[in-house]
Swiss-Prot record:
It comes from the Bacteria. The keyword Coiled coil does not apply. F-type ATPases have 2 components, CF(1) - the catalytic core - and CF(0) - the membrane proton channel. CF(1) has five subunits: alpha(3), beta(3), gamma(1), delta(1), epsilon(1). CF(0) has three main subunits: a, b and c. Gene3D superfamilies: F0F1 ATP synthase delta/epsilon subunit, N-terminal (2.60.15.10). It is found in: Cell inner membrane. The gene is atpC. Belongs to the ATPase epsilon chain family. This is ATP synthase epsilon chain. One of its GO terms (cellular component) is plasma membrane. It is a peripheral membrane protein.
Length: 136
């Protein structure tokens, strides 16, 4: 049976290069699955869990947005950041999210820092969601 080659690359380093039966990707319009022989395409990724399935075993990674290129039995994930969901400190993520929300209370939505804090809230919420989904 054909396999996918899946690579996850961030600006800092190559996180992963493995063979998989299927990849489930957090696309710009929702989750989508990729199996060998899939039609080539390019898509935006939203922050969320990228799940790889190999022989019935699932392994998930948090990806902080970016792009995914599918083609020739290969999935190339170009992520802003990525980490195994098993390494996510959920309590730490909740704390960072709450701190950012607290800082936002004293800001106008036109304040340049407001968008940065809002991005922190979205990212930490996505990390928590990815960790909880993978552990369920």
């Amino acid at each position: 049976m054909a396999k996918l080659t899946v690579e996850i690359v961030t600006p800092e380093k190559r996180i992963l290069s493995v063979q998989a039966d299927e990849a489930i990707v957090p696309g710009g319009r929702g989750l989508f699955g990729v199996r060998p022989g899939h039609t080539p395409f390019l898509s935006l990724m939203e922050p969320g869990a990228l799940t790889l399935i190999e022989s019935g075993r699932r392994e998930s990674y948090f990806v902080a947005g970016g792009f995914v290129e599918v083609g020739n039995d290969k999935v190339l994930v170009l992520a802003d950041a990525a980490e195994p969901v098993t390494g996510i400190d959920v309590e730490g993520a909740r704390r960072r999210m709450a701190e950012a929300q607290e800082r936002m209370k004293g800001m106008s939505s036109e304040d340049a820092r407001f968008e940065l804090e809002q991005a922190t809230v979205r990212r930490e919420a996505a990390r928590i969601g990815a960790a909880n989904t993978a552990r369920a």
